[in-house]
Each structure stands twice: as structure tokens, then as C-alpha cells.
């Protein structure tokens, strides 16, 4: 593993004892840099390794089916780990308290964990680290170019981070080594997850997205064969999209972006426009979102908006709105806009919304809300509560782009939006067959 992927975030004296990998973002056994690093450390120290997962009692507005997606996937990951002599332990409660209790309980000598810049994960770490008396190493397994290696500041937009990432890609976009075999087996008694009880508790995941690493790889192969060849032409067409449909798997860490990039680069018969267009989204735009959250602690508030956008939204705060939507109206997909309603119903039915539509969807919420603060809060509640890929850096950056001009520039001034870019129903009709999309989701 490239040493720039790991950093010591809790400097405590080295101790003898097992290695614990606190898995909270990269929920997979394959292609997992944090797991690989933890296994290397355990083998080098002559110590056993286990993986600890803490199911928080709540995760913002996430719904039971989101936990079901996670738990179903974890059951498969646990089987893969067990086959390699690595137990997966699942604890319940507040991660900032429960993980240190577990680490102390097994007399661990070292803890490895996932890097994650989102607000809730920062809070978990802030609570956990003072309670740990062992070194803690954080590994960036989410980004192909580790976020802290790509840039040391918040980037203005894609064009400012793109050359930095492209320069470093040859150094980081490499194949994955095999997971190091464990020389010392885990023998300490640890509770094994009661999968039957957990699956009963959370119910079924959304039918549109079968969970787990195997399903994620199958979805990737389907995309490579069916959708990637036409990605350049159809990626922004919600009716018959060439979208990858990988975002839930990437969000839950059941599939790594680096594996996706390697498969895309190896795929045969793909034109450069399709290949480059997809890799721009997979690498540059995703890692720009990571950069935004890493260097903007208030990434889920209007404080994250650039000064020009904050000023223009304030200037137009009192503009008359064409419609003031109620919360219940939005959640039910019962607005005056048929395209918005269809997008919301797609989200309600599948846990997924097409990427172009999500931008349009958020901008209409701004148009129908008394102010940008209310609009952002509403979008966060709906996106984080309904979307399988919610509660993610890409969602925070995307909503900040849609409502607050983050990673964008001023556009011609309009009512309500000011100089923040607007998107309209008439513009959507010029782009794709809106009537066909509305008809598809009218009864959802």
C-alpha cells in the first residue's frame, strides 16, 4: 500500500496485543486498503486481526431499508473474512463509546480505521480517540488519490483539482495485492453477529439494489457491457439512462472506486469519450466532493456557500416564489411540477434518483422554499432519508452546488436564484423526453 494512504491520527505508545480494524465506511473484504494495511500490521507484529463494526442506533434520517442494505452486505463480508481467519464483530450503540470499549476489552495494541470527512464521522472520532490508549491509524480507501495527497486546501472547482489528481493517478491507480494471510489466528472469545435477528429487525433492502459485494461486482459488469459503451450519449437521459447505478455500492463501500476504474480502463471496445466521461465522474468529481467535505467542516450548511452565492441569495431572499411547498407535499411527490414529482417518486420507489434529475430536483426546492437555508435543510432531509447513496460527500457537495453555487460560477441573474445557476422544466424538455419519464413514474 502507498504510504500516503495512511496517517497516524492518535499517537499513543505502541503496545502488544491484537490489531482491530474499525470498519465504518469501506464495508467490504475485497480491494480494501484499510483491511490490507491492518492485515499487514497484524502479520508484521505477530498478532491476530479482527474487524469491528458498530451499528449506530441512528444515522441521521436513514431509514430501516438502508440499514437492511448494510446488514445484508455485511453478512456476506463476514463470511469472506471468516474464510480467511478474520472474525467480524458487530457491536451496537454509539460508536464513539462502544468501539473504545471493544478495543480495550480485547486488549488490542493498535487500531486501524477508515478515513471519512463527513460531520457524523468526525464526531465519532472526536468521541472515540480520547477513550483509546492505543495508536490509531486512518486509511483513505475511498479515493483513488488520497484526499490529503491530492490537495491541502478546499478546491474552487473541478478544473482546479483535476490537474492535481491527474498528475498523481499513475502513482496511486495500481492493482490490489492479495490480503496478507494471518499468521496468528484469533482465539479470544468475541460475540458473533446474530444475522437472523438483524435481518428480521431491519427487514428487506430496496428491491432495485440487491446488496453485497457479489451484487456490486455483478452490477459493475452489467454496466461495462450494456451502458458504458453509450455513456457519452445517454448518461444525462433519465428515460433510458446509461448511468452505472453503482452509487449505493460505492457509498456503502461494498465496491471500491479503484476497482471500478481498473475495470473501466481494461474494458474492450469502449470509445475514449465514454471512458473519459465516466472516469471524470468517478474520479475527479467524486474526489472533488471529498475535498469539499474534508476542508469544509460545515459542508451541510449554508456556511459552505461561496461569498458570491451567499450574497446573491441574500439579495433575492424576499423575491416572490411561484409556489411555497409544504414538507408533506415534497415528500409525497405532489408538487406543481410533473417532472419533479416523477423524480421524487422514483426516489421513493427505488431509493435512487438519476444524477441530472437530482440537480434539477434540488433547484426546484430552492424555488419553492422561503429561503436557501430552508431549501438546503429540506433537500438534506429528503436525500439523506430516502436515497441509498445519501449521507455521502457526493450528496453534500451536489446539494451545495445546486442551492449554493459551490464548485460553480455566477450566471445571469434571475428571480429567487440571483446569479446561482437555475434549471427549468422547459430546459429539461429540450434535453430529453420528459413526458416519457413522467409516465413511467406516475403511478409509483
Each model region followed by its residue ranges:
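N-terminal regions that are enriched for targeting/export leaders
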Residues: 1-19, 25
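Glycine-rich phosphate/pyrophosphate-binding loops
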Residues: 39-55, 353-354, 370-376
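Active-site-proximal binding-pocket segments
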Residues: 237, 241-435
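N-terminal catalytic cores of NTP/NDP-binding nucleotidyl/phosphoryl-transfer enzymes
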Residues: 16-40
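Structural beta-sheet core signal
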Residues: 21, 51-53, 138, 401
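N-terminal Rossmann-like or analogous alpha/beta NTP/dinucleotide-binding catalytic cores
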Residues: 37-40, 45-49, 57-112, 118-123
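Glycine/tryptophan-enriched, flexible segments
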Residues: 147, 153-305, 432-444
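Beta-rich, aromatic/charged-enriched effector core domains that present basic-aromatic interfaces
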Residues: 87, 92-208, 399-402
Amino acid at each position: 500500500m502507498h504510504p500516503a494512504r495512511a496517517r497516524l491520527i492518535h499517537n499513543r505508545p505502541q503496545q502488544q496485543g491484537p490489531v482491530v480494524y474499525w470498519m465504518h465506511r469501506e464495508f467490504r473484504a475485497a480491494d480494501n486498503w484499510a483491511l490490507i494495511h491492518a492485515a499487514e500490521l497484524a502479520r508484521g507484529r505477530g498478532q491476530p486481526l479482527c474487524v469491528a463494526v458498530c451499528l449506530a442506533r441512528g444515522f441521521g434520517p436513514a431509514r430501516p431499508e438502508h440499514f437492511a442494505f448494510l446488514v445484508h452486505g455485511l453478512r456476506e463480508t463476514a463470511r469472506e473474512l471468516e474464510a480467511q481467519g478474520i472474525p467480524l464483530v458487530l457491536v451496537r450503540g454509539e460508536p464513539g463509546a462502544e468501539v473504545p470499549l471493544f478495543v480495550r476489552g480485547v486488549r488490542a495494541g493498535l487500531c486501524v480505521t477508515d478515513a471519512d470527512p463527513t460531520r457524523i464521522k468526525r464526531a465519532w472520532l472526536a468521541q472515540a480517540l480520547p477513550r483509546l490508549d492505543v495508536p490509531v491509524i486512518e486509511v483513505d480507501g475511498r479515493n483513488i488519490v488520497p484526499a490529503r495527497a491530492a490537495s491541502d486546501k478546499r478546491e474552487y472547482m473541478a478544473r482546479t483539482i483535476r490537474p492535481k489528481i491527474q498528475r498523481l493517478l499513475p502513482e496511486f491507480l495500481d492493482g490490489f495485492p492479495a490480503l496478507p494471510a494471518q499468521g496468528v489466528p484469533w482465539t479470544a472469545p468475541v460475540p458473533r453477529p446474530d444475522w437472523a435477528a438483524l435481518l428480521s429487525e431491519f427487514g428487506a433492502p430496496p428491491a432495485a439494489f440487491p446488496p453485497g459485494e457479489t451484487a456490486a461486482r455483478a452490477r459493475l459488469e452489467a454496466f461495462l457491457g450494456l451502458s458504458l459503451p453509450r455513456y457519452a450519449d445517454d448518461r444525462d437521459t433519465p428515460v433510458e439512462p446509461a448511468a452505472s447505478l453503482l452509487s449505493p455500492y460505492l457509498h456503502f463501500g461494498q465496491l471500491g472506486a479503484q476497482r471500478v476504474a481498473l475495470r473501466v480502463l481494461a474494458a474492450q471496445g469502449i470509445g475514449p469519450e465514454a471512458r473519459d466521461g465516466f472516469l471524470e465522474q468517478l474520479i475527479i468529481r467524486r474526489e472533488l466532493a471529498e475535498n469539499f467535505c474534508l476542508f469544509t467542516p460545515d459542508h451541510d450548511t449554508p456556511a459552505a456557500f461561496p461569498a458570491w452565492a451567499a450574497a446573491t441569495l441574500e439579495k433575492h431572499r424576499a423575491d416572490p416564489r411561484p409556489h411555497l411547498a409544504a414538507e408533506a407535499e415534497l415528500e409525497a411527490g405532489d408538487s406543481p411540477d410533473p417532472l419533479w414529482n416523477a423524480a421524487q417518486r422514483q426516489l421513493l420507489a427505488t431509493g435512487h434518483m438519476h444524477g441530472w434529475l437530482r440537480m434539477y430536483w434540488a433547484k426546484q426546492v430552492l424555488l419553492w422554499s422561503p429561503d436557501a437555508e430552508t431549501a438546503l435543510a429540506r433537500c438534506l432531509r429528503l436525500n439523506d432519508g430516502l436515497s441509498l447513496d445519501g449521507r455521502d460527500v457526493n450528496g453534500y457537495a451536489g446539494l451545495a452546488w445546486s442551492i449554493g453555487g459551490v464548485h460553480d460560477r455566477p450566471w445571469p441573474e434571475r428571480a429567487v436564484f440571483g446569479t446561482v445557476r437555475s434549471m427549468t422544466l422547459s430546459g429539461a424538455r429540450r434535453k430529453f423526453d420528459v413526458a416519457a419519464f413522467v409516465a413511467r413514474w406516475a403511478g409509483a
